A protein has these predicted regions:
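Bacterial N-terminal signal peptides
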Residues: 9-18
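Extracytoplasmic
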Residues: 28-30, 58, 76-78, 85-87, ...
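Sec-dependent signal peptide cleavage junction
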Residues: 18-28
């Protein structure tokens, strides 16, 4: 009898421990992530460690997402993404309806600002390699120009990105 009682008590304690964090309060917007250390930054283009990325990835959507089955990037925040192989130029059309936390609309100007920030001579983060194949990167990164020549606004929700090489 003692063994049965001990087993049931152990099982109850184990189930309590396993299920203690399983339910969220209705309407809760809190997320809990187990990390090996405290994030150094939550600025998306300034992170260098996986622990930072784990938090940042929960904060906002991205222009592209990785297809879980094929590992090929697919548009997420983009309504369309077209590529012209002759000119090595992408045309990105941002989905309307995204807003900043203050309610202001997210426009293609914000995307262009971010890409040019990553190419800037003043940028010290590790993500500049993400834009290094865009035309005009070398000039922007050296401080010779402000912004990349391969990044052009078409309208408030559309832009072109020309690569420097394939």
């Amino acid at each position: 009898m003692k063994r049965v009682f001990s087993f049931l008590l152990t099982l109850c304690l184990l189930l309590t421990a396993l299920l203690s964090g399983a339910a969220l309060a209705e309407g809760s917007t809190q997320i809990t992530i187990g990390l090996v250390g405290e994030p150094d930054t939550i600025i998306p283009y300034m992170y260098t460690a996986d622990k930072d990325a784990m938090v940042i990835m929960q904060m906002m959507p991205y222009l592209f997402k990785r297809n879980d089955e094929t590992s090929i990037p697919e548009p997420l925040m983009l309504e369309s993404c077209e590529f012209d192989a002759d000119t090595l130029t992408y045309t990105w059309k941002l989905r309307e309806g995204y807003t900043w936390t203050d309610g202001e609309p997210l426009t293609i100007d914000d995307v262009i600002f971010t890409l040019n920030t990553l190419a800037s001579a003043d940028y010290t983060g590790g993500a500049s390699t993400n834009v290094s194949s865009i035309a005009g990167y070398a000039e922007a990164h050296s401080g010779e120009t402000v912004g990349m020549s391969g990044v052009q606004k078409v309208d408030d929700y559309t832009m072109t990105v020309q690569l420097s090489a394939w």
